[in-house]
């Protein structure tokens, strides 16, 4: 209910009045055994908005917690209020005591109740329920229930509980120990080594319990202090766990070795959310998810000292984004390969890092609406040009020079006149030509592969290599002093000749430019000889100009290859990898610019994590305890402020021709001595107190490097070179001039001003993104694995403001949404739709429905602020509800689609049936007409074919009869001739004795014997001749009888053949007529689809036709069955016809064989005659009669079946005919 207004409540909003009444009511109803409220971490009272906002009258806030036994109990607002009042009292007493941050007995202390308990409550389940730590439950309970007076003396409490503390020993290291006693400002501490030391109480810091050793996020530490943070990072580092969290900031410690925490398997695990441990992959994944969810550009800002691992971290982030947003175009692979190119041309070995980035880069990766990479854009800042010509001992120039000399092919070396790296002055001056464990030749081959992948043509590659070789040969150009004034001339050797050849200019012109300078005196042009120093600067200036422009041109080519296409949506993730903070023994203009860039990045870091955060809390009226931090704005003012900032004074001095580095140093001391970040030194030196520490600078070379002069004669020489790239560079240089280029002029904009403009442009771009910070830490200065230098790490942590980040993250609200945004995104999750529809009421109702603890959020005037992890709970629930909605919609849409499909299917089938029926009827008419025409033609053709066949058979029979007659005639002639020969032989034998001469009587007996034998042989021959004649007569008689019978048989066969042919023709004509008549008559009332039959002459068995949709009939006899019966009958007719033809052929062949036997009888092997042709003929006739009788019976049956089918067709109508 709503309380009436009173003087005490007039200033309160309606929401506060309602909350107060609910708290009072809960206090009355609170059970006696209610456990004490948990100490709030961070300190928050969930302040509600002022009277401008109001909540529903029925609004109630309650939370849940777990007691010591693990059961869930309710924590009412009254309990929270009582706890808050106790906390306020504790804070007031601690403020009166004056305690240093997390130490004992100091003057100041920024309290957070989290640091007062050695065993603080662990994180809640799902970020909503707070659970008490399961370790030392008894001590935990005692801490919550002990009197407030015990907290007033932390040292006594630690002595009583024998808790561990951190103390700094004489060597500056932190060690664990236990307080033995205390007096005044000193304490006796027993170290873990059993030694007792006396230390200042202010130097004691509480140590965390063992359960918190090596936690992933520093926020989880019960006591937040420098030794605890150092120890936690050290434990993880020695376990090769190099990534930790400090609230929203990822801390990456360089392991200086390969660790097995990368690769496709790990990438897949983070993509699928299987792993959530701190990792650069996790940061990249969070940036990608936020980009897709919020549709806002993201940025990964990687910072740290030189050698801390920024470049490698950036490569791993790009690797993850390439895997996450990889598409079909393959641009992500090109993006990864750009790193290889940029490292070769922009990285070098320094005293602190073997692969130090000597330029800053921002790579902006663009994504399509589907989250796929569609292109990228690369920006670079302040390449260290001086490294091309000047090196400190133990350092190297850019990697590309050494890789080119080591890995170029013999043909390329011959073309570029290349030698080994040791023969070039620019490379050999530092006595460092190689890097341990690095193969420059192999690196060069990988570079060539990267060039091909990024699609830089071979021609452009060779041009770039030619200019690199020209730079190396320029370094070998030497000078000869010609007079006492130290004027010089160029030595004409192979160095200047090769340099001129590679640049595409005349050797003499190059020598003139290197040794003289043209001055304009009125209308006259005077050539002034240069001194050795001036000539050397001119030579080095040309080399630096060529290399710097070549680097910029290479970046342009990469941007062309990675250009974003039409799929650009404005969504992007930028990765910033810039040189780290540097402080060497000798620090010049380059270190000043690098440290200035890091100061600007630190300000961006402070702005987003401290300034904007706390300003927004205060403006929106939420309860907030301000966190102090070190602001570097004063240092930035020292550098940037006009007109007496360091850069402004540098530009002013650079414009004075007679100004020197000493006059510049004096001017700095004169104008900047009041700034606390500046300290003048003797001579040309001065100190700047940067955020990362104090750096001593030497102004030697500041003015010259800031001017970066380039004489007009040099630009004119480059523009006249045959090399296309040099012409391009000179054209760009002319275009950058703000006024017409005169002979003695150089470009006007100074390097410092240009770099400042680039930084401001970079900051503006980063301001329009959601930043994700990665702080890289260098564990030791020797670049050795498993070496942890606490002082070096602590210095970097202080510079990064890690402890302040953790404090503000503990008590901060990283997620903030306007009431409208929160209600619009999560309002549909409400189960109660009766809630007022204003955004604030909806937002509070959602929080109430999911029992979000008041400590986990605050309600501002315009926004809702949530602790870390709370938004993930609402996103998970929203995702589940949306998935359920989508599933329901899917099933409903599926039901509608299936119903629509079934309806369309029914309509389609009806339409198809009508169309198919019409097509079938048209086809039947066409085939019937064609069949009638083909039948008439077929009958004519068949008649002519029969006549032709008969004529052929008759001719064959006539020829056969003629041949048999000829053979008989030949046999008679042979018999006659044999008779005549026998008669002549007999007459000759009778005449022999008459012709013989007289013989002696002694041989008479022999002659008589021979005569008797001859007579006997003659009589025997006569008898055989008589028998043969008789046999011939009998054969002639039998032949005449056979001839008569054969003629009679042929006549009978021909009659029967004609009769069967006539009967078959009549049956076919009758069948065709009946089929045509029945189908034509039933066209409108039958459902049988028309079928066409083969013509009678071919006797085909095919039955083609068109089917129509089937239908159900009451008598169970479907059209399909009747069609099959009709087809069966027609098949039977075809079968009978084929059988008739086959049988006819068989009988013809048998009869022909009988005739052949009759004409030429042969003897069997045993000498007996074969069976007589008459017997064979009788058997053949019997077989023919039997087959004819059976064939006629089957013809009658088939005819009857045809009549029956025709009757069935007449009794049934087509189903669509009935519908009509």
Swiss-Prot record:
Localization (cell): Cell junction, Plasmodesma; Endosome
Key words of the record: Actin-binding, ATP-binding, Calmodulin-binding, Cell junction, Coiled coil, Endocytosis, Endosome, Motor protein, Myosin, Nucleotide-binding, Repeat
InterPro entries: IQ_motif_EF-hand-BS, Kinesin_motor_dom_sf, Myosin_head_motor_dom-like, Myosin_N, MYSc_Myo8, P-loop_NTPase
Biological process annotations from GO: actin filament-based movement; endocytosis
Tissue expression pattern: Expressed in flowers, leaves and roots.
Recorded coiled-coil stretches: 1003-1071
Biased composition (Polar residues): 1-12, 997-1006, 1098-1118
Residue span, Myosin motor domain: 213-879
Residues that coordinate or bind ATP: 304-311, 353-361
Residue intervals of the Myosin N-terminal SH3-like domain: 160-209
IQ domain sequence ranges: 881-910, 904-933, 942-971
PROSITE patterns for this protein: IQ, MYOSIN_MOTOR, SH3_LIKE
GO cellular component assignments: endosome; myosin complex; plasmodesma
Biased composition (Low complexity): 40-54
UniProt note: domains: IQ domain mediates interaction with calmodulin.
Official protein name in the record: Myosin-2
Organism: Arabidopsis thaliana
Lineage: Eukaryota, Viridiplantae, Streptophyta, Embryophyta, Tracheophyta
